[in-house]
């Protein structure tokens, strides 16, 4: 299994699939799956290519989810090896996307292949949902596929997302949920004027200071047994023309909240509006909800994944809901149990991104064993 996974991972890495350009990665995957009798369906939206592949027609539906797109490489001269050469040095596979997430994608594909070869008449359905739009806008990828599947009554019961979840060793962390993410673009109005004549102007920065203090110090909740407390961070702030003698006419503040299941996006919006009105500010605010929080409590999927890690890798994982958002947030809307398990995340989005070849082989075995645990032999 190891050589098959590594060879496929190298093939995928050598395709410079900067989001949302798939560069033929999904075609390679589709051709492999077709040979095993998978039904292949292409769901393309705008510049994004999405693949929905299935083997079987009954319940439960066990899906693997992942993405073929990668982030830009940055200055390629800073890499020890060309970022799309997929070189292996001391058992480490180097390249953009090696850890995030072409390595785990290869492990998923080979695990599914091996399982189907051994169990051609398996129970349930094995599915793969693969997109080329995860790293950038994430507007035409998994979310659109999920919407299409739900519209025609298709469901997913269990889904493993191959995002790089591991911290210090393979399998030490399994993500069983994610916080929600909501961004506010706030415009506070003032009256522009000359700094020497402040009585003829109204400085929105000065007016907003007490509000900003309250916004950044407010305790939204205390978290719970599954999630850390909700946090807010100001990401961008701007006012003025660049001149030192002009009072700005508008203050722009962009802030983001990563929120847990103790609050809702509506509560957040209402509380911010309440603060703004309390401080008598004239404003406009635009909200962007990237995703609601989701949680998979201990059940069939988590048990299957944990048992696979213990039997194959000899490790009992920590369950965690921290970090950023993932496409799991869209799949959870289907009512599916969703967990994330993938390689180490220490080098993702960095120069010299890499993954252990040994880890990829182990990951493939873990994924295959998960299928055995859920669908039987």
UniProtKB/Swiss-Prot annotation:
Pathway: Amino-acid biosynthesis; L-lysine biosynthesis via DAP pathway; LL-2,6-diaminopimelate from (S)-tetrahydrodipicolinate (succinylase route): step 3/3
Residues in coiled coil: none
Keywords: Amino-acid biosynthesis, Cobalt, Diaminopimelate biosynthesis, Hydrolase, Lysine biosynthesis, Metal-binding, Zinc
Entry's cofactor comment: Binds 2 Zn(2+) or Co(2+) ions per subunit.
Binding residue positions for Zn(2+) 1: 67, 100, 163
Cofactor: Zn(2+); Co(2+)
Top EC category: hydrolase
Highest taxon, organism lineage: Bacteria
Disulfide feature: none
Location of the active site: 69, 134
Single GO BP term: diaminopimelate biosynthetic process
Function: Catalyzes the hydrolysis of N-succinyl-L,L-diaminopimelic acid (SDAP), forming succinate and LL-2,6-diaminopimelate (DAP), an intermediate involved in the bacterial biosynthesis of lysine and meso-diaminopimelic acid, an essential component of bacterial cell walls.
Subunit structure: Homodimer.
Family note: Belongs to the peptidase M20A family. DapE subfamily.
Name recorded for this polypeptide: Succinyl-diaminopimelate desuccinylase
Organism for this UniProt entry: Mannheimia succiniciproducens (strain KCTC 0769BP / MBEL55E)
Gene name as annotated: dapE
């Amino acid at each position: 299994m190891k050589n098959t996974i590594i060879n496929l991972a190298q093939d995928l890495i050598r395709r410079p699939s900067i989001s949302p350009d798939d560069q033929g990665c999904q075609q390679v995957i589709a051709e492999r799956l077709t040979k095993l009798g998978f039904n292949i369906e292409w769901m393309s939206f705008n510049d994004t290519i999405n693949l929905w592949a299935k083997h079987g027609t009954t319940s439960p539906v066990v899906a693997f989810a992942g993405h073929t797109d990668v982030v830009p490489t940055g200055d390629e001269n800073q890499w020890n090896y060309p970022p799309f050469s997929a070189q292996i040095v001391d058992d480490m596979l180097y390249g953009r996307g090696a850890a995030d997430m072409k390595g785990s994608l290869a492990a998923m594909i080979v695990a599914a292949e091996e399982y189907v070869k051994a169990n051609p008449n398996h129970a349930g359905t094995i599915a793969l949902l693969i997109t080329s739009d995860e790293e950038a806008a994430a507007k035409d990828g998994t979310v659109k596929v999920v919407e299409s599947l739900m519209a025609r009554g298709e469901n997913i019961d269990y889904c493993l997302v191959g995002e790089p979840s591991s911290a210090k060793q393979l399998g030490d962390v399994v993500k069983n949920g994610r916080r929600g993410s909501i961004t506010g673009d706030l415009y506070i109005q003032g009256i522009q004027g000359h700094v020497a004549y402040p009585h003829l102007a109204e400085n929105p920065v000065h007016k907003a200071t007490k509000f900003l203090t309250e916004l950044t110090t407010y305790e939204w909740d205390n978290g719970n047994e599954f999630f850390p407390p909700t946090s807010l961070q100001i990401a961008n702030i701007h006012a003025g023309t660049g001149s030192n003698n002009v009072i700005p006419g508008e203050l722009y503040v962009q802030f983001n909240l990563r929120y847990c299941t103790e609050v809702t996006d509506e509560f957040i919006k209402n509380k911010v509006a309440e603060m703004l009105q309390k401080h008598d500010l004239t404003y406009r605010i635009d909200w962007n909800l990237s995703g609601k929080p989701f949680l998979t409590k201990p059940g069939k999927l988590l048990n299957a994944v944990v048992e696979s890690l213990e039997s194959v890798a000899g490790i009992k994982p920590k369950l965690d809901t921290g970090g950023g958002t993932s496409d799991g947030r869209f799949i959870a809307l289907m009512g599916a149990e969703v967990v994330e398990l993938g390689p180490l995340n220490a080098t993702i989005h960095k120069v010299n991104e890499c993954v252990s070849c040994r880890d990829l082989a182990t990951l493939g075995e873990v994924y295959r064993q998960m299928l055995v645990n859920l669908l039987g032999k």
